[in-house]
Amino acid sequence: FFDDNLAEKIRTEKLLENNFQQALENNEFVLYYQPKYGIKGAEPELHGAEALIRWISPEYGFLSPGRFIPLFERDGNLEILDRHVLKLACRQLRQWLDAGYKAVPISVNISRRNIVGGNNFLAYALDVLAEYQIPINLIQLEILETDASVDSKLLIRFLQIFKSSGFSLAMDDFGSGYSSLGMFNSMPIDCLKLDKSFFDSWQPDMSERDSCLIKYMIKAAHDTGRTVVAEGIEEKFQVDLLRQYDCDMIQGYYFSKPLPAEEFASKMHKRV
């Protein structure tokens, strides 16, 4: 029974890998947008969104990133997918702008290997922004923390080039992977996204000691000129405590799940 399940898993993964190029051509990859809300004012305010890839497969149906991203990390297709996601996000932003929306910044995830790779992702990114006439301040690049194979000094050098080109940079899922606070301090990033795992253990009746690490991480980020986004927030008491700690933005199911483009657009204001 176990062997049958394992064999089926391997077969499915191989099919997904083999179907990648065809899926690109058939527009099977779509973006969902999870809002980021600022919590410093009297009322939560939409400040941006993270573009999250989904695969609508004719054979397997709706596939979340956990089903295919690890496969593409192995076979090199992730670098191609990164480019595709950026293009989809810019195309959607152009549609919103043309329709009269006050578009908010959209962040896209970029693998570390793409940042330092020889495929010149920076030139590609600038070309796509120019093609769709997207102001560079409407795209933020989120650097995934989960790849330890990239030399940190090399990564920092390339990130400085991206930043000098005008891109806003965020460290995604901070605390889930290989970055240290020391490395964070030396990276030219504008935003720190605190991983969901920090907040999973929070309880309404917990002591301040149980959350003091987050308090001081937010302060450290602010002291070095960065903004902070808390990810995976689902409860009101979490929002209240993060507001008390001066966190800038919240991303999570408390405010909204990831939304199709049409639903997300309804949360943006139209230009007068």
Predicted region positions:
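Active-site core of bacterial EAL-family cyclic-dinucleotide phosphodiesterase domains
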Residues: F2-L71, N109, M171, Q251, ...
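Catalytic core of bacterial c-di-GMP phosphodiesterases, primarily the EAL and HD-GYP domains
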Residues: D3, K9, G38-E50, I56, ...
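EAL-family c-di-GMP phosphodiesterase catalytic domain
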Residues: E8, I56-E59, S111-V116, L138-S152, ...
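Helical mechanochemical/support elements of P-loop NTPase systems and associated helical scaffolds
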Residues: T12, L16, S64, F121, ...
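Hydrophobic (often cysteine-bearing) scaffold residues that line and stabilize catalytic clefts
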Residues: L16, L78-D82, D210
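Structural preference for long, well-ordered alpha-helical segments in enzyme cores
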Residues: L16-N19, A51, R67, L71-F72, ...
